[in-house]
Amino acid sequence: MSEYVKFTCERTNAEFTAFDGFAELNAYRRQLRELRLMGVDSNGVGFGNLSVQDGATKNFYITGSATAGIPELTLADCAKVLAYDFERNWVGYEGSTIPSSESLTHAAIYESDAKAGAIIHCHDSRSWAVILNQAPTTSKTVKYGTPKMAYEIMRLFRVTDLHSRKILAMAGHEGGIVTFGRDLEEAFAVLMHERKESSPCANSAFHKRTPA
């Protein structure tokens, strides 16, 4: 298992059938990589992940751990999350790759907002610095990829305008931003709007990115 994955996991099947939205996921992922909002840092650590939810089953498909450096994903580079348990710090999945280290974070968003259908986690230090404590922001003491992060995000849904803002900053992980929407188009649009508001012409800088 990847050293960055902090949950225990259980695989039920090594393969799953192609899902609607896989081509779209790859397309938006390609744009994020071109903007250097996901990829691999100078230490060789991948950062950034995406997911889409199956509205019928509430399962969700997420990019696999340690796949951020792959230019174009195949189905084998994704995982289908079937179940999770925050208290046990556990994820049940299908697929040949381990789900992203942020799988519990994605699960918390889908559980908290019935309208959420897609999530983007990326790293953009410039936008992060602007929205930190201005948009919904997780506690600086909470680490990424943990049950505490899942619970913290669920708290933000209860006490902030996260439902309407659809974006949050991770105070304890410099550069970490999460956006969501009814689909990837909306999640990406939220992210691009914040980048434009932060600095229309600036290139992002990156620090201490969250492993995929």
Locate predicted features.
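Glycine-rich flexible loops
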Residues: 1-212
